[in-house]
Amino acid sequence: MACILKRKPVLVVSFIALCILLLAMRLVNDATFPLLLNCFGQPKTKWIPLPYTFRQPLRTHYGYINVRTQEPLQLNCNHCAIVSNSGQMVGQKVGEEIDHASCIWRMNNAPTKGFEEDVGYMTMVRVVSHTSVPLLLKNPDYFFKEASRTIYVIWGPFRNMRKDGNGIVYNMLKKTVDAYPDAQIYVTTEQQMTHCDRVFKDETGKDRVQSGSYLSTGWFTFILAMDACYSIHVYGMINETYCKTEGYRKVPYHYYEQGKDECNEYLLHEHAPYGGHRFITEKKVFAKWAKKHRIVFTHPNWTLS
């Protein structure tokens, strides 16, 4: 009897230690947890990431300047969810999972209202092309009043973003912050735009301008997210071979509108002699980055060789 009583404290301590170990493993591997589930034959297991708080003081990103205050962006996230605009998101029902991330990133004018079950309803960072700014301004109350806590990062060429009164998009943004003083709108600096072009050339061996292409909003999103996030979970983005896969799922280019077929649009842009986005080429680079950073792609899952 005495031996049994002596063992009880040992068993309790061991049990507590095991629980702490499992929790630590979950925290460390949260970014890759969906893939670990797949390894154990649970590809359909619902994964809800643990809620995070900022893990350290906000980090300053000097390539992004606030339109109203002219101060650089300060942002630092633990677990980021990047939600693709792709029709792949239709019917996925991962909105609750997405909203558990510490920072939820969206692109251009992709809405959440009416699509919450699939894509969630929260947005912390929205990266927007200069060409999509007029689309935001069609519904300014929704984007800049109701979503005043969202950080907007606008990218675009110098001719549209110049601050001397001749930058047509910058002028739109100035008027927007005058009308919505709480709006957090940042623009990408000319130096940061050059940096993004340089990264494209370093990764692909091709000069973006000479190849007649434009970087996508996804490219600018990844550049900032890899600098601001400890781990990244990308939802709804296809890889570079998806459209060549037999029996692939045909979906709209955007989850929020019918019309263009995603794969047709990708192939059209990839081979356009001028003015296209090299979506497929970019996906090859994203796969390369995922091997070096804590990046996971799901819905559909990516296999990184």
From Swiss-Prot:
Membrane topology: Single-pass type II membrane protein
Keyword Glycosyltransferase attributed: yes
Tissue expression notes: In adult tissues, high expression in brain, lung and heart and to a lesser extent in kidney, mammary gland, spleen, testis and thymus.
Residues glycosylated per entry: N239, N301
Intervals, Cytoplasmic compartment: 1-8
Pathway assigned to this chain's UniProt record: Protein modification; protein glycosylation; Glycolipid biosynthesis
EC number: 2.4.3.7
Cysteine disulfide links: C80-C229
Gene Ontology biological process: glycosylceramide metabolic process; protein glycosylation
Subcellular location: Golgi apparatus membrane
Broad class of where this protein is predominantly found: Golgi
Any single Gene Ontology cellular-component annotation: Golgi membrane
Reaction catalysis annotation: an alpha-Neu5Ac-(2->3)-beta-D-Gal-(1->3)-D-GlcNAc derivative + CMP-N-acetyl-beta-neuraminate = an alpha-Neu5Ac-(2->3)-beta-D-Gal-(1->3)-[alpha-Neu5Ac-(2->6)]-D-GlcNAc derivative + CMP + H(+); a ganglioside GM1b (d18:1(4E)) + CMP-N-acetyl-beta-neuraminate = a ganglioside GD1alpha (d18:1(4E)) + CMP + H(+); a globoside MSGG + CMP-N-acetyl-beta-neuraminate = a globoside DSGG + CMP + H(+); 3-O-[alpha-Neu5Ac-(2->3)-beta-D-Gal-(1->3)-alpha-D-GalNAc]-L-Ser-[protein] + CMP-N-acetyl-beta-neuraminate = a 3-O-{alpha-Neu5Ac-(2->3)-beta-D-Gal-(1->3)-[alpha-Neu5Ac-(2->6)]-alpha-D-GalNAc}-L-seryl-[protein] + CMP + H(+)
Transmembrane regions: 9-28
Lumenal topological intervals: 29-305
InterPro entries: Glyco_trans_29, GT29-like_sf
Keywords for the protein's UniProt record, in alphabetical order: Disulfide bond, Glycoprotein, Glycosyltransferase, Golgi apparatus, Lipid metabolism, Membrane, Sialic acid, Signal-anchor, Transferase, Transmembrane, Transmembrane helix
A GO molecular-function descriptor: alpha-N-acetylneuraminyl-2,3-beta-galactosyl-1,3-N-acetyl-galactosaminide 6-alpha-sialyltransferase activity
Role this protein plays: Transfers the sialyl group (N-acetyl-alpha-neuraminyl or NeuAc) from CMP-NeuAc to the GalNAc residue on the NeuAc-alpha-2,3-Gal-beta-1,3-GalNAc sequence of glycoproteins and glycolipids forming an alpha-2,6-linkage. Produces branched type disialyl structures by transfer of a sialyl group onto a GalNAc residue inside the backbone core chains. ST6GalNAcIII prefers glycolipids to glycoproteins, predominantly catalyzing the biosynthesis of ganglioside GD1alpha from GM1b.
Family from the record: Belongs to the glycosyltransferase 29 family.
Name this protein carries in UniProt: Alpha-N-acetylgalactosaminide alpha-2,6-sialyltransferase 3
Organism: Mus musculus (Mouse)
